[in-house]
């Protein structure tokens, strides 16, 4: 039996319709769903998520459990709508070793949530939730959005990157860096898996692309890009608007 056939069987189960009615009832704040084991919980979740009525946040017991659950959902739904929200630390928080890749994943989740995309599903675990995040307002102030065809001064973009504490380098190879070569700005946002290449023609953005770090070759054309700095940098010292991740979520989010 294929994954598609399994999902179709779950979709036709009478309890799915009952669950959807419960999720749509705003007067109900808590309910219990039991009797699931192994990957059956992922299958059930994938059917509910596919309705795209609410954002979902699944809180697993630890990193390993969250990783397995995330992998199952990606196999069922694809990568576009399923996001992973890890701890920003490589090991336990007490060791203080930040992981740039994890920080990218965390920032991407916040950026996607702020856009209020329908059908988002986020998988996380307690260690990740223990770390506070910036507020919606703080994130908005620390976000630069650029679109192909925008009329914007190249120096303005450079000034914003400096203000965001991006590091000027010859070649971009890790998040938080930018480089300038002629009419091109390369920048590695903390909200993207790949760095961006912004090509100007005078005061107009002629093209936006992602590129590979190792080869420095262009990868994919984009209509728009979102540039976000390291949101944790300096906030603890400045007393920035740090809040719980759960407070960042919209009121219609389903926690499971």
Predicted feature descriptions by range:
Residues 1-256:
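ASCE RecA-like P-loop NTPase motor cores
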């Amino acid at each position: 039996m294929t994954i598609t056939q399994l999902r179709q069987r779950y979709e036709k189960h009478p309890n799915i319709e009952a669950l959807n009615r419960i999720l749509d009832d705003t007067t109900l704040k808590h309910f219990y769903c039991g009797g699931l084991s192994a990957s059956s919980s992922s299958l059930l979740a994938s059917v509910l998520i596919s309705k795209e009525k609410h954002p979902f946040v699944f809180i697993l017991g630890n990193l390993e459990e969250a990783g397995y659950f995330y992998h199952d959902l990606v196999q069922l739904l694809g990568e576009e709508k399923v996001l992973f929200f890890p701890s920003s630390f490589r090991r336990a928080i007490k060791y203080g070793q930040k992981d740039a890749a994890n920080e990218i994943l965390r920032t991407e989740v916040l950026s996607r949530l702020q856009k209020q995309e329908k059908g988002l599903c986020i998988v996380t675990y307690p260690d990740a939730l223990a770390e506070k995040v910036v507020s919606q307002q703080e994130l908005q102030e620390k976000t630069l959005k650029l679109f192909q065809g925008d009329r914007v001064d190249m120096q303005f973009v450079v000034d914003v990157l400096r203000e965001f504490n991006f590091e000027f380098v010859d070649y971009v190879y890790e998040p938080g860096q930018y480089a300038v070569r002629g009419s091109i700005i390369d920048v590695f946002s903390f909200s993207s898996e790949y760095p961006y290449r912004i090509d100007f023609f005078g005061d107009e953005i002629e093209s936006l692309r992602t590129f590979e770090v190792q080869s420095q070759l262009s990868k994919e054309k984009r209509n728009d890009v979102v540039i976000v700095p390291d949101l944790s940098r300096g906030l603890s010292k400045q007393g920035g608007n740090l809040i719980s991740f759960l407070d960042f979520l919209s009121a219609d989010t389903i926690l499971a």
